[in-house]
Amino acid sequence: YDWAYCQFKQHNFSQALDGFSRYVSVQTGGNRSMLADAYSRIGDCYYYARRFADAEQYYARAQETDVANGDYALFQKAFMAGLQRNHERKIELLDKLIVDYPRSGYLANAWFEKGQAYTILNRNNDAIVCYKQLIADYPQSAIARKGGLQLGMVYFNNGQTDESVAAYQQVIERYPTSEEARIAVADLKSVYVEKDAVDAYANYLNSVGRSEQAPVSELDSLSYMAAERTYMTGKGIASLKKYVRNYPSGAFLIPANYYICLLYTSPSPRD
């Protein structure tokens, strides 16, 4: 057992697997906690070898051997189900973890992974519930930051752009120095372009002290992109005229004015 752990700590997973397998083959009764731990480590070794079905089998043995301390094994069992694309089974096992181990240290991860499974299944409303629960219950956890990003993405994919903006802004304001905040700024940009509200994006970045992440040249490009998108969807030229007005020396004045002229000279001009 100790030799196997030494191999495991050194990432020699093949040797560790051999050691733990020999340990469980001769262990009869005795310390069930150690036996369950060995089963979990065998599961880990199979996981690192990408033998997910075998890993799931040994995590199940670990959880059954020491039920009272089986939250890690149950979480990993659910994770293996997801890696095998059995997302419904993954959700079922995570629900069991949440109910059976209400004080587990893996609950934050369980809510996140459950949200991921629902997202893959295109059950966006269920995913939203999971990410919101994660953020509400574990706001200071690292996984909550990732959950906030996922929440913004799912809202956006759901066509709920206002909610998406709020989710990304929460990540930026609650975790300002994090990598997730930097990603949220970039993702928020796409939402504001979709909303044709680049000015609001610039104003928001100024309000939270991140104006350096949106230089004038980028705002020029984003404003034109949003205006062109509006034009291409048949919604008139108001956004193009606004771009020309706000960026009199803009990099896209020629195509913007061209589109405006096209609309004014069309048989049924649109404003």
What is the role of each PLM region?
Residues Y1-S266, R270:
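Acidic, polar-rich low-complexity tracts and alpha-helical solenoid repeat scaffolds
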